Amino acid sequence: MILPINTYSDEVLRRKAKPLKESDAQLEELISNMLESMRNAEGIGLAAPQVGVSLRLIVVDLSLAEGYEAASPMVVINPHILSVKSFNSMEEGCLSIPDVRGDVVRPSAIQLKYRDRNFEECIGEFDRLAARVIQHEIDHLDGTLFVDRMQRRDRRKIQKELDALSRGEINTNYPVAFHEDSVVK
């Protein structure tokens, strides 16, 4: 089932998500729905808070990105970054902040501890686009949006677009959830 994606002004995007304690049929359904919703929106990453669920769960599928066509979808539960290497700046966007893009500095490689779709504990090394997408989605679990990480002068350049999103002026090809009473100031 395709879920609506919560937008910039929704308070669920500003909350720290709760860890998952176990896997069950509801979690499996949420994972499947998130993957379907992400693909429908032509995204490469999606965090549970973006679909209104405040849990530490992300899905990533880089197969839509050039050079990553063979990538398999990844489910990341309760992620924790163990280490980082070097930093670089790259333009990012977000399904919750449609049509807004900006440069963000992030580590270019990470070591990540997490649980997979089967709730098995994993430690993985990720670099380049995979590292960036995972960090972007982990930020969602911590109530941080990519625009919060932009340099102040760059953020000022997109403020009009953010204000428009806060007013509900949203044009996407995928379903969104807009909650007027949770506008971020």
UniProtKB/Swiss-Prot annotation:
Q: Show the catalytic activity.
A: N-terminal N-formyl-L-methionyl-[peptide] + H2O = N-terminal L-methionyl-[peptide] + formate
The family database entries (SUPFAM superfamilies) matched by this protein are listed as: Peptide deformylase
Pfam families for the chain: Pep_deformylase (PF01327)
Annotated coiled-coil positions are none
Task: Give the UniProt keywords, A-Z.
Answer: Hydrolase, Iron, Metal-binding, Protein biosynthesis
Q: Which residues bind Fe cation?
A: 94, 136, 140
Q: Name one GO molecular function term.
A: peptide deformylase activity
| Gene3D superfamilies in alphabetical order | Peptide deformylase
What is the uppermost EC class here?
Answer: hydrolase
Q: What is its EC number?
A: 3.5.1.88
A GO BP entry: co-translational protein modification
**Which cofactor does the UniProt annotation name?**
Fe(2+)
Q: Name the residues annotated as catalytic in the UniProt entry.
A: 137
As to how many cofactors bind and how, the note says: Binds 1 Fe(2+) ion.
What HAMAP family does this protein's entry cite? Pep_deformylase
What the protein does? Removes the formyl group from the N-terminal Met of newly synthesized proteins. Requires at least a dipeptide for an efficient rate of reaction. N-terminal L-methionine is a prerequisite for activity but the enzyme has broad specificity at other positions.
Say which family it is in.
Answer: Belongs to the polypeptide deformylase family.
Official protein name in the record: Peptide deformylase
Whose protein is this, by species? Chlorobium phaeobacteroides (strain BS1)
